Regions:
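Non-catalytic interface/linker regions that flank or bridge core catalytic/transmembrane domains
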Residues: 1-128, 132-133, 317
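Histidine- and acidic-residue-rich, metal-dependent catalytic cores
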Residues: 82-318
């Protein structure tokens, strides 16, 4: 069994499980040590400066399990979701080029699995509706963006990764907005909204010089809150000038926000969210992309209304 255990990360490990209660070195940075042997200790400690190394190690282990063909697709997707959450947590703490490149690997793994396993499409669609609303919203928006991009005909994996990165990074500018505004459990006042509306420009400034991100990804971060009739923000540009990636992220953002549990609102079922978007938020989204989003969840646009029952969801590999 021990031979099949994964290698340990290059960190020194200590234990307090000693008679005098003082830390005792279990393993030097590069010393071979059995992972199975560690299970003999109730708690293993590392130095604070090694925390990032251990986080990267855990992320890579989780990520690798997400592409193992011998695992059920549900388990692979759950592994990728966990890796994505770890990556995004680091990204919001430090939106550095290094952390953005790490996030790109996670998005690439989602796309890789989606393009090779028809079942992954259905699991992804369900996955995006069940994350609590914190950093996970960025992961959900990335997932929805990838799904919608594939649905409308994107087949090149690098394009889908760019779309997914746009979804993942769309709210990165909120690192520059006061936490009390971000976490307010109710409606924002005019001053707070004025601050919140700065996040697309802040986000664009953070990522504009990162060479591994494409121009269309960067513009999606800037433009995802533009609207029809030049009523959006930050630049109130004509709707025809808003990029396709930006429009994909806009609808993915809204849909994921509505279908995710928040401190002040219950998560809506996909059908309920689509009805609300159609009836109340149509000025914020592209009509053709909305039609495709409806089809993803097995419905017909003409069947969406505030009354009656939701249409039966079809299982499709598209």
């Amino acid at each position: 069994i021990d031979l099949k255990m994964p290698p340990l990360p290059a960190v020194a490990m200590f234990t307090y499980d000693t008679k005098d209660g003082k830390p005792e070195l279990l393993r030097e940075y590069d010393q071979p040590y059995s992972p199975l042997a560690l299970t003999a200790y109730p708690e293993v400690l590392i130095k604070l400066e090694d925390l990032k190394v251990l986080q990267h190690y855990a992320e890579q282990r989780i990520l690798s399990s997400g592409v193992q063909k011998n695992l059920p697709v549900e388990k692979r997707m759950e592994s990728l979701r966990r890796a994505a959450l770890l990556s995004v947590e680091e990204l919001f703490k430090d939106p550095s080029p290094e952390n953005i490149n790490r996030s790109r690997k996670v998005v690439g793994s989602f796309v890789y699995l989606l393009m090779r396993d028809p079942q992954a499409y259905l699991v992804l669609a369900r996955l995006s509706s069940h994350d609590p609303y914190t950093l996970q919203h960025s992961v959900g928006a990335a997932v929805n963006s990838i799904i919608l991009g594939k649905k409308i005909g994107f087949r090149n994996e690098s394009d889908l990764i760019d779309i997914g990165m746009a979804g993942l990074l769309h709210d990165i500018g909120k690192v520059g907005v006061a936490p009390e505004i971000i976490n307010k459990p109710g409606p924002l006042d005019d001053r707070e909204w004025s601050e919140m509306r700065k996040h697309p420009e802040i986000g664009y400034e953070i990522i504009k010089d990162i060479p591994t991100l494409t121009g269309v990804t960067k513009m999606a971060v800037l433009e995802h809150h533009e609207e029809k009739h030049m009523k959006g923000y930050p630049n109130k540009i004509p709707w025809d000038d808003v990029g396709l990636y930006s429009k994909i992220v806009a609808i993915a953002d809204i849909f994921n926000a509505l279908t995710t549990e928040r401190s002040y609102s219950k998560a809506k079922e996909p059908y309920e969210a689509l009805v609300l978007i159609k009836d109340k938020l149509s000025n914020k989204i592209d009509d053709e992309l909305f039609r495709e989003m409806v089809m993803i969840y097995g419905g017909q646009l003409e069947g969406l209304s505030g009354a009656g029952t939701a249409p039966q969801q079809k299982e499709t590999s598209e």
